[in-house]
Amino acid sequence: MAALQSAPDSPATQLEPAEDGSECDADPEEEEEEEQQEEEDEEEEEEVVVEEVATPVQEVAEVEVEANSADNGGGDDDDDGGGGDDDVEEVLAEEQTLSLGTQERHSNGGHAKAPVLQGKALQTSRVSPTTQDEDVEEEEEEEDEEHFLTQGLVTFEDVAVYFSLEEWERLGVDQRDLYREVMQENYGILVSLGYPIPKPDLIFHLEQGEEPWVEDGPHPEEGDVVTGVYTGAWFWNDDIEDHEEEDDEDFLAEVAEEENEPPGLWSAAYGVGDVPGTWGPDDSDSVQTPEGWGPNPGSLGILAEEVEAKHFLSGREPGENFLVPWAFPAVAVPIGCPETTCDVCGKVFPHRSRLAKHQRYHAAVKPFGCDECGKGFVYRSHLAIHQRTHTGEKPFPCPDCGKRFVYKSHLVTHRRIHTGERPYRCVFCGAGFGRRSYLVTHQRTHTGERPYPCLHCGRSFSQSSALARHQAVHTADRPHCCPDCGQAFRLRADFQRHRRSGGCTEPSSGDGARMAPHEVGMAPNEVEMAVAAVATVEPEELEAAPAETEEPEAGVADGDTEAEARQDEQVVVAPAAEATVPDSKKDPEPDRRFREMGNGLAEGEGPSSHPFGFHFPMHPKSWLHPDGFPILGFPEFSERLQADGRHLPGPLGSPLSLQGMGLACDPFRSVGPGAGVDGGLRAFPPAVRSLLSEPAPAALAEEESPWICSDCGKTFGRRAALAKHQRYHAGERPHRCADCGKSFVYGSHLARHRRTHTGERPFPCPECGARFARGSHLAAHVRGHTGEKPFVCGVCGAGFSRRAHLTAHGRAHTGERPYACAECGRRFGQSAALTRHQWAHAEEKPHRCPDCGKGFGHSSDFKRHRRTHTGEKPFRCADCGRGFAQRSNLAKHRRGHTGERPFPCPECGKRFSQRSVLVTHQRTHTGERPYLCSNCGRRFSQSSHLLTHMKTHRGPGSAPAHTSSTKAQAPAKATPPLPPPGSGSGTLLEFAGGTSFGSDPAAFAGPSGSYEESIL
């Protein structure tokens, strides 16, 4: 317990000086009594408060003294720390009881009899207040109830205990496990009681299996980022899912770094998000500071969770300061240094000058404005950082590849691509990631979480970017327009990529045919058909004067319901024959896109405030007729028209008249070079319009526009994937290994390659514990345990656990030998066989046998050869104990015990355990007899039969017979005389493949002349 008692920042130590009331935080009731009561009543009330606070502290001290005395007098058995677990558990329980009871007492308006979360120590030792004190408290309870409710929120910090590194190292393994268990249990209790507490960093790191110690050191200065504290520390807002806001987040991080301010404060001050005065989900991170140096830890997080996406200024005047004191109801202003405490957010500063500078954020004073965009900033340094976005300055270069970045955080993240560093590990599969946000997104594949639902169709997605791409199916809006070439983009990321590429082309002026989609920056197989639900147009109305219009209700999407569709039919619009296309292509506000339609509409009005449309993937050749307007040409919709009984006035692709058509004009998305009606107008028949008001088919909603590689024809769902793929064809390999210099196309390939240098094998087998560097290798290995062979040969039915093995096996049927030797031209079916063969041509054979002098180019071949001299047989059968020199021979032998017969005869179906036995058996069907007796010319199908037959030519006392055997297709060779029987020199057998001597019946020379060992 020395570690707990000696901790300088432990809760018990911090509460000890409160016994005399000298440093105890004054009860909030004292502030009210200074204005309402006399000085005597104030002193009396203060004594009661001090007495109530000091009594629990005395109990904690008494409990610790009793625990220490029990430890000292408990006998020799406790000297070795055997009772450390009980001490840690007791102190943690007391701390939890004290903190929870005190907080609950405050949350009940200061009532002395609040029963919830009261510990036994508080119940037995509480000094009962006098009747007069109870009356005073009851009178002020209603008055201060709201104030206490806001300041009495229980946070995890109130029941948490922290250790320094030195103290943590003193704890035993059991004590550390007990600490982890108690901390997680405390958090679970708070959550079960309904407190809106976000998960603290301490619990997160405990779940990750990391050490929870707190780094020693002096208190940081105001605003410093405390990187050594796992809980209660500021952290960078770099885990935002929406990467479109990444620039804003990095700017805030850079500002915080240069101004020595916590980034979370900048997020709150600037209101990261598109809606000013709204606390968005990006601000709900755990905004915490060390005690005494900012808001109550976790309080801002609680606030964000309670009022997430709710306006602070409901009913307020526009432009009024939204960061007012009532906007932070959960922040308690520290007592004791009010002259340096912010009365808005409760942050404490060491000097008044720092407080005055900080209050600029709340007062919205931004004296430094940007000349380019007019954006204001509190500090000049912030303006300098912001101006990099206009000047293009990138002061942070990568030392490896030279690429430059605007923000230092971008450089740090980019550097991980070169180093292969992946500091964030998945607890489920061990996969590593370079960003925490990537880890969070990846873990959703394990948990199945899909937090981003589509408001149109209800489909959910695990990533916000996937939702954004999906929503393009439901809307035709392209709010990001290029001022140079006029191309419009749905996503800001696509627009920024277009601007960086510098591929803008000015549209040519003059009349001309409408451009194809691929000529205006659209996907080659994507056609955008935007329809605004307006009234039909009669021919005589085309030349009529503009008429007054009735605009549909703003804010309602057209075509959502049948009633709205009927309402749209009643809208009267008299468009002119020509629509004026503005000179400036700059995209105005989304709700004022149709103001220059040229059809008599008033300024700011339009056919609809929410145009709808869909994207239909189709071949570019059928997307438009050269003499008419683009109309629906997707075959699937043609079938739908026929099924629904709706007919177009003409065949698909034919010229279309404006009579009876609905018109829609968006001049800021006009793609044709000519002016007039074609400059942004789209015409569709009513039948098509009613179809488009219905939800898109699931197949169309799911389908992505493929991007085709012009080199190999491979298709991709995204342009970024195609760009990465084209690196293969271009030979670009930007990711280089620092150890061996090998280059890779993808950063993930480099990270996987790095494991060959580090020896890391993050994928363990759950069956045998073997570890692998790749997940695919582990999957193939697991099939060895399960016996699964999903890759089956279509010719012979043989199964394989790996696709590569099936591919190599298939070449045995086709006779393909794609690997040729450059030296001799010999071809092989496998690359490994070619590699082994090439050692025969290599002059250098570093592995030479000391017994026979034979050289080998590969160490494995040399080791296998050495076993012929040493007689070593390292592979032993677990059933019979027989040893083998090669693993393959052991595998063949094992089939005799297991009964496995993987080689079936295609003629009769009989199965065999060895391929050589199958080959011998097949001769009974083919009639082949390759073994010839040179004496009588008789043939045999097996060499053993020939050996038995040769004994008939040698009678007792007769001269040795000259015998030989050959294959039928090869002539017999002359053989020397046989040695006399019993000479021990063996029997000479001659084959087309060579000669072999053998006295052991278990050894024989096969038809190929190679030596074979009997396995069974």
UniProtKB/Swiss-Prot annotation:
Q: Compositional bias (Acidic residues) at which positions? A: 17-50, 74-93, 132-146, 541-553
Report the SUPFAM superfamilies cross-referenced here: beta-beta-alpha zinc fingers, KRAB domain (Kruppel-associated box)
User: Which cellular component appears as one GO term in the record?
Assistant: nucleus
SMART domains to which the protein is assigned, alphabetical: KRAB (SM00349), ZnF_C2H2 (SM00355)
Gene3D superfamilies from the UniProt entry:
6.10.140.140, Classic Zinc Finger (3.30.160.60)
Compositionally biased spans, kind Low complexity: 51-60, 570-582, 963-973
Q: Where is the composition biased (Basic and acidic residues)?
A: 583-596
GO MF: DNA binding; zinc ion binding
A GO BP annotation: regulation of DNA-templated transcription
Q: Domain KRAB, which positions? A: 154-225
Say which domain of life the source belongs to: Eukaryota
InterPro entries in UniProt: KRAB, KRAB_dom_sf, Znf_C2H2_sf, Znf_C2H2_type
Cite the record's Polar residues compositional bias ranges.
121-131
Q: Where in the cell is it found?
A: Nucleus
Query: What Pfam families does the record tag this protein with?
Result: KRAB, zf-C2H2
This protein's UniProt keywords: DNA-binding, Metal-binding, Nucleus, Repeat, Transcription, Transcription regulation, Zinc, Zinc-finger
- Per UniProt, the C2H2-type Zn-finger stretches lie at 340-362, 368-390, 396-418, 424-446, 452-474, 480-502, 707-729, 735-757, 763-785, 791-813, 819-841, 847-869, 875-897, 903-925, 931-953
Q: For the region Disordered, give the residue spans.
A: 1-147, 541-606, 950-1016
Q: Which family does it belong to?
A: Belongs to the krueppel C2H2-type zinc-finger protein family.
Function comment? May be involved in transcriptional regulation.
Put simply, this protein is called: Zinc finger protein 316
State the organism of origin: Mus musculus (Mouse)
